[in-house]
Amino acid sequence: MKRLALLGALAAVLPPAPSNAQTVGGVELIELTIAEAHEAMLAGTLSARQLAEAYLDRIEAYDKRGPAFNAIIMTNTRALARADSLDDALRATGGLTGPLHGIPFIVKDNYDTHDMPTTGGSASLEGSMPADDAFQVRRIREAGAIVLAKSNLAEFAFTAMETVGSRIPGWTFNPYQLNRVTAGSSGGTAAAVAANLGLVGLGTDTGNSIRGPSSHNALVGIRSTQGLTSRDGIMPLFAHRDIGGPMTRTVEDAVRIFDVIAGTDPADPVTAEADARRPPSYMEFLVDDLEGVRIGVAGQLAFTETADPEILMRFAAALDDLRGLGATVVDDFAIPDLDSLRRGLGCSRFRYDIENYLATLPDPPVSTLEEIEEGGQVHVTVMPRVRSYLEFEGTPDTHEGCVRARANEERLRAGVRGAMAERDVVALVYPTWNNPPRLVGDLESPHGNNSPILSPPTGFPAITVPMGFVWDETLPAGLQIYGDAWSEPTLIRIAFAYEQATRHRRPPETAPPLK
């Protein structure tokens, strides 16, 4: 715990960010957006190499030194060569190679990458090389992106509460207060993007893991409709709930990525309808008014006995902001019998899913969950879950708990849809967390995690967007926006309008501009 005490002291004495900017290629690197980077690249003042080098310098300065966020498992040794090839292409053609040309990504280390190991944050899979890229990684590379680094995660994505595993020692720390958690499991991507160690990132979400860390790190995160984005090449936790998606500093950047990764993938049958369901571009829904939009307040999630009063104050202010944008906010919305509808939704199929994933690897270091358990190369906090998941027998189609969960999920979907139709609302809003980020090591105080309650078991989409800061303006809070299947256009419209009206996002002071 000496490390935690030192971090607490450091968090208290770190100076505010200096006023001088970190300029690269004529643009300000801190909080740089995709559009700003592309404008400078097309003007000839910024190269992809310059941009990648600038972020690599920040990783070198801040991830294992100084504040030591511990967000990055490894950087990509081929990143600069990739940047050079993109610069050559731009010089040759005068145009960008794609909508993500030269954009450095932080990718969670449960996405397959053909040129880097994929470990799921576990020493048991150290050096494990997949045969090819995950579908989403392939899509962003085809759009011109640079995979700059693989990020740390809660080992095997097991927990929403913290980011710690056996692949690299220690926790990943929250850049806003270094003695606080990032949440999990995509805490490495969240911390890195929040601290401007990369321009944007990819995370995954089974119950919380895009939206929770995004909220705790003042980011935007999108969990799509189940079936709109491919799971191919994502190391599974529970495959029926797993979704990958963007984690960014702005709604617009998240949507630019979402445009690239959403769609049908023959390798993932659940995406069969995706191309037919998605619009040509989600960018058209970046509008800054909400006239005619009816939004329900999910008070059953927000107004709990342990909810932090400052979070609720921020939530009340957010509701006023939505009204000011023209939305009709339905305060007394409720889902009948929600407590009973939430029961019996578990299907702990990790053993089945991880063994299917391991079978896709050309030379897996282990082939079964039993071998992972016997090898002992997992974090001490993870081993009890590994052993509990070993009890799963059969397949998700035959396992009694999974069969029961599917029926209960359908009841929950019907209950949510019925309540939304009754009140004629197109979206629900609630705090992403009812409580601010916990202290590292604290697994007892209230957390108020609302992300697993509606979106994962229904398969419906949700977006989190910064809602401001609490506790002397030091700890981030997030507003979550949830809707029916395929309602991403509406959710994006609400998120963008709210973001543009409030501008709550700000960078952490622990990672100031480099000189």
Regions found by a protein language model. Give the residues of each.
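Short, well-ordered alpha-helical
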Residues: Q22-T119, A123-E126, F156-A160, T271-A274, ...
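Gly/Ser-rich, acidic/histidine-flanked active-site/gating loops
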Residues: I30, Y111, P117, I243, ...
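Structural helix-boundary/capping segments
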Residues: E142, I146, A194-G296, T304, ...
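Glycine-rich, small-residue loops and helix-cap segments
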Residues: G44, G102, E142, G198, ...
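Short helix-loop capping/hinge segments that flank enzyme active sites or metal/cofactor-binding pockets
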Residues: H101-G120, E284-Q300, S348-R417, P466-P476
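Short glycine/serine-rich loop/turn segments
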Residues: L100-G244, P269-A272, A298-Q300, L428-P446, ...
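Bacterial N-terminal signal peptides
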Residues: A5-P15
